[in-house]
Regions:
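Flexible, glycine-rich beta-alpha linker
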Residues: 18-19, 36-37, 61-78
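Active-site Tyr-X1-5-Lys
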Residues: 20-22, 33-61, 87
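C-terminal substrate-binding subdomain of Rossmann-fold SDR/epimerase-dehydratase oxidoreductases
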Residues: 86, 90-204
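Active-site loop of short-chain dehydrogenase/reductase
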Residues: 4-9, 58-59, 91, 124
Length: 204
């Protein structure tokens, strides 16, 4: 690392580092307390990033996304799982009707990440890069049902092993980076469903 000249090291963390959200919004300054392995590993990555970059004098920026979705997403997130089941005509299982996520369209994340990677104001800073407004899983399914009128779903109790999340504050990214997310869930799902349907047709 000493011989490599980095302009900036950008680490993609996760909203899972916060653990259970204690307030209406999660801020970058809030205490991190992950409650499962993924969030723990992401937080460990943040600590390693800060430690190594400080030691080798490398500028860094840490990004915390949440519930990313959009074209080419094959990571078995809830948005992709539900959309895939809807296309196949399978019944959706909603673990927690009122479970909230700050759904973030991939293009907004990409744009925000570029801003964070290039801005001098982002040096050695951590940013929430999300849409900035949480929606429930049920609201997501209702949007999905507009494209799949015969969509069936059942409700089950939320998985208490997973953190209870919600909205991430993006006020810091707005102020320092001029970050302006465009895709609310309605807009984003329109593009996502169009991609998924065209992808299915191409595979025939």
């Amino acid at each position: 690392m000493k011989k490599t000249k980095f302009q900036r090291f950008v680490y993609f963390s996760s909203s899972m580092v916060y653990g259970d959200f204690k307030k209406n919004k999660a801020y970058e300054t809030d205490k991190t307390n992950p409650k499962e392995i993924y969030g723990t590993m992401k937080l460990a990555g943040e600590v390693a990033t800060k430690g190594l970059c400080n030691f080798y004098n490398i500028p860094y920026t840490i990004i915390r996304p949440s519930a990313v979705y959009g074209p080419t997403d094959m990571n078995q997130r809830v948005t992709q799982i539900f959309l895939e089941k809807a296309i196949k005509g399978e019944t959706l299982i909603i673990n927690g009707k009122d479970e909230k996520l700050d759904f973030t369209f991939v293009e907004d994340l990409a744009n925000g990440s570029i801003l964070a990677a290039l801005s001098k104001k982002a040096l050695n800073q951590t940013f929430n890069i999300t849409f900035g407004k949480a929606m429930t899983l049920y609201q997501y399914v209702k949007i999905l049902s507009k494209y799949f009128p015969r969509l069936k779903y059942i409700f089950k109790e939320r998985d208490h092993q997973r953190p209870k999340r919600g909205t991430l504050s993006i006020s810091k990214a707005k102020k320092l980076l001029n970050y302006k997310p465009y895709f609310n869930l309605e807009r984003g799902m329109k593009k996502y469903v169009e991609f998924a349907k065209s992808f299915k047709e191409d595979k025939k």
